[in-house]
Amino acid sequence: MDYNQRHKNCIDQFKKEFEETAITVSGGANYAKVADRQRIFREHFPDAQVLTDLKSIDDTHVVFKTLIKVNDKIISSGWSRTVLKSKAKAIEFGETVSLGRCLANFGLTGDEYASIEEMIDVPNIKIEKPVVK
């Protein structure tokens, strides 16, 4: 199967499953978990390389860049910048956000571009609908 058909099938599966796995926050926007995006992506692109690179770290921030390659061609990228003091696991969180943005750039995104992982710490945001598995 060629790349374009695999991409279409991946997006179609994501949209179908998003109906069941989306997390709704106050205001009615629906978000996807990075783990759900990655699982679906891997089903359609098991041969892809996901390359996460810690670009910089200092006393206040950590910056990650994630690339996805298929057949040695970059098909998507994503960046994150995380405040170190805001999370106990800021490095892991930053890597996850970078991957989520990379998968969103690929087309695996819900009603909103951000993932639920990014939205959890936003002030005045309340999760209304839990994940259904």
Feature names for model-found ranges:
Residues 1-133:
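Polyanion-binding surfaces on beta-sheet-dominated domains and ring/shell assemblies
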